[in-house]
Amino acid sequence: MSDTVERVKKIIVEHLGVNADKVVENASFIDDLGADSLDTVELVMAFEEEFGVEIPDEAAETIFTVGDAVKFIDKASA
């Protein structure tokens, strides 16, 4: 598992209080992990801070799953 995946999982577990076993690549923040719209905004802000990347609103609106977040961060960090 990549460093990005581990760090994203850690942020999600800390912010949403979910079991790490539920934080899998295709898990939806809202449908599978119980996040609401405020939670998703806070997750995006936490990802930006942790990885030193900017996630524009347009991009944030396309990040629905753990895998989406990892792909965006890896691409933005490259």
From Swiss-Prot:
InterPro entries for this protein: ACP, ACP-like_sf, PKS_PP-bd, PP-bd_ACP, Ppantetheine_attach_site
Q: Name one GO biological process term.
A: lipid A biosynthetic process
The UniProt entry, under SUPFAM superfamilies, shows: ACP-like
Domain Carrier, first and last residues per copy: 2-77
HAMAP family under this entry? Acyl_carrier
Q: What does this protein do?
A: Carrier of the growing fatty acid chain in fatty acid biosynthesis.
**Which protein family is named in the record?**
Belongs to the acyl carrier protein (ACP) family.
The identity of this protein, by name, is: Acyl carrier protein
